Each structure stands twice: as C-alpha cells, then as structure tokens.
C-alpha cells in the first residue's frame, strides 16, 4: 500500500491571513481555531489534500520549487480577476495559463477553464 498526501504545508508570515486567501480561492473555510501562528484549511468536498499554514520568523529566500496549478471553473480571465481581488498578483500571462503570486509571494498558475476550451481543438505534442 502506498502513502497518501494528507496535507500540504506552507511556511508564512501570517498563517490566518494566508489561509484566508487560499480558503477563498478554493471555495472552502479556514478552521475556526486558526491564529496568526497556525491555520488549517480543509480541502473542499473532502477531496484532499488539506493545507497547513505555519508562521515562521524568516522570509522566503528562494523561488518556490513547487506550486499549485489551478484550473479555472469557467474562464481563465475571470478566475485571474477573482484571485486578484483576493490579493493575488499577476506575474506573467500566456495563452494557456497565467502565473500569479498569493499575498505572501508564493507562486501559483491559473490554467484555462472549460469555457475557454469550448470549440478548441487540442493537439498533443
């Protein structure tokens, strides 16, 4: 039997604030016991993995070696706009995805949504 990813952990400056961003981005809630020191976001629909946010004293010193790719629920443009209203910042735009950072500078990508793909022919490379 293989291991399962239970949670993904973030080191951050303000655990409750960053958890709030990701909970809103993913359509779920921050655990009611969240503090600026630690916070927990349960995956929507028990689809795992969950997210832990832990306050650490040092700021990030290098580029993320891992990031989330989010599929837009409708269009990429609308999802990028929604995430920006929550505090994310656009870093670079491409036809197939947009690179953003969350409020603490962690990289994430937003990919095309189903409405973007309607009528398009996808070719495997």
Predicted regions and their residues:
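A ligand-binding cleft/hinge motif common to bilobed small-molecule-binding domains
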Residues: 38
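Short loop/turn microsegments at loop-to-beta-strand junctions
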Residues: 95-97
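Glyoxalase I/VOC metalloenzyme domain signal
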Residues: 1-34, 42-92, 101-125
